[in-house]
C-alpha cells in the first residue's frame, strides 16, 4: 500500500502554503446585505446583552435594520417629492414616520430634531361650509314685490 509520487499533507481545512490567495468575503456580502454584520456583531458582544451570541443573530438584526431604514427612506423620499424638493430633510422624515400607522406606533416616543409637527387644525376652528351657501342664496333670489295698491 505504498504510493509512488508526492505525499499529500492534511491542512485541516486550510489551503496549503503557496496556494493562490483569494479575496476575503464579508459576512454582509455573504448575506446579501448593505448593513455591516461584523460591526453589529461587535456591538452586540460589547453591549453584553447576553452571555453568548448565536451566529445568525447579527445577520438577522442587520437585515431588520436595513429593511426599516429602506422603508423610512422610501416614505421620506415620497414626502420630499410631494414638497417638490430633491433632498430629504428632517421634516420629510417626520412627515413620513408620523403619517405611516405602523412606523408611527414603533417610533411614537422618538423626537426628531428640526422635524416640526404634523399639520393639524381642529375641525371646530375650520370655517363652516354651510355659512357661505345662505349668502349666495340671498343674492340669487329675486326681490319680493310689495302688493299693488288700487
UniProtKB/Swiss-Prot annotation:
Q: Where is this region: Disordered?
A: 1-27, 129-150
Kindly state which keywords UniProt assigns to this record, in alphabetical order.
Answer: Chromosome, DNA-binding, Nucleosome core, Nucleus, Phosphoprotein
DNA-binding in keyword set: yes
The answer to whether keyword Phosphoprotein applies is yes
Output the PTM entry: Not ubiquitinated.
A GO CC annotation given for this chain: plasmodesma
Which GO terms of the molecular function aspect are on file?
A: chromatin binding; DNA binding; protein heterodimerization activity; structural constituent of chromatin
GO BP terms: namely: heterochromatin organization
Q: In which tissues is it expressed?
A: Strong expression through-out the roots and leaves. Also found in meristems and dividing cells.
Q: Which domain of life is it from?
A: Eukaryota
Q: Where in the cell is it found?
A: Nucleus; Chromosome
Family per UniProt?
Belongs to the histone H2A family.
Tell me, what does this protein do in biology? Core component of nucleosome. Nucleosomes wrap and compact DNA into chromatin, limiting DNA accessibility to the cellular machineries which require DNA as a template. Histones thereby play a central role in transcription regulation, DNA repair, DNA replication and chromosomal stability. DNA accessibility is regulated via a complex set of post-translational modifications of histones, also called histone code, and nucleosome remodeling.
Where is motif SPKK motif found?
Answer: 146-149
The record's subunit annotation is:
The nucleosome is a histone octamer containing two molecules each of H2A, H2B, H3 and H4 assembled in one H3-H4 heterotetramer and two H2A-H2B heterodimers. The octamer wraps approximately 147 bp of DNA.
InterPro entries cross-referenced by the UniProt entry: Histone-fold (IPR009072), Histone_H2A (IPR002119), Histone_H2A/H2B/H3 (IPR007125), Histone_H2A_C (IPR032454), Histone_H2A_CS (IPR032458)
Comp. bias (Basic residues): 1-12
Protein name, per record: Probable histone H2A.7
Which Pfam families has this protein been placed in? Histone, Histone_H2A_C
Chief location of this protein within or outside the cell: nucleus
> How does the entry describe the domains?
Contains one SPKK motif which may interact with the minor groove of A/T-rich DNA sites. Phosphorylation of this motif may regulate DNA binding. This motif is reiterated in both termini of histone H1 and in the N-terminus of sea urchin histones H2B, but its presence in the C-terminus seems to be unique to plant H2A.
Q: Which residues carry this modification: Phosphoserine?
A: 146
Query: Which PROSITE patterns has this protein been placed in?
Result: HISTONE_H2A (PS00046)
Amino acid at each position: 500500500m505504498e504510493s509512488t509520487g508526492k505525499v499529500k499533507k492534511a491542512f485541516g481545512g486550510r489551503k496549503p502554503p503557496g496556494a493562490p490567495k483569494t479575496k476575503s468575503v464579508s459576512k454582509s456580502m455573504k448575506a446579501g446585505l448593505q448593513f455591516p454584520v461584523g460591526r453589529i456583531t461587535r456591538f452586540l458582544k460589547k453591549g453584553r446583552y447576553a452571555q453568548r451570541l448565536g451566529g445568525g443573530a447579527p445577520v438577522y438584526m442587520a437585515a431588520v435594520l436595513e429593511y426599516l431604514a429602506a422603508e423610512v427612506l422610501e416614505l421620506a423620499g415620497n414626502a420630499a417629492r410631494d414638497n417638490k424638493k430633491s433632498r430629504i430633510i428632517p421634516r420629510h422624515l417626520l412627515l413620513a414616520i408620523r403619517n405611516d400607522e405602523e412606523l408611527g406606533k414603533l417610533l411614537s416616543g422618538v423626537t426628531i430634531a428640526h422635524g416640526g409637527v404634523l399639520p393639524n387644525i381642529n375641525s371646530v376652528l375650520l370655517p363652516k361650509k354651510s355659512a357661505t351657501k345662505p349668502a349666495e342664496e340671498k343674492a340669487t333670489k329675486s326681490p319680493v314685490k310689495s302688493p299693488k295698491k288700487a
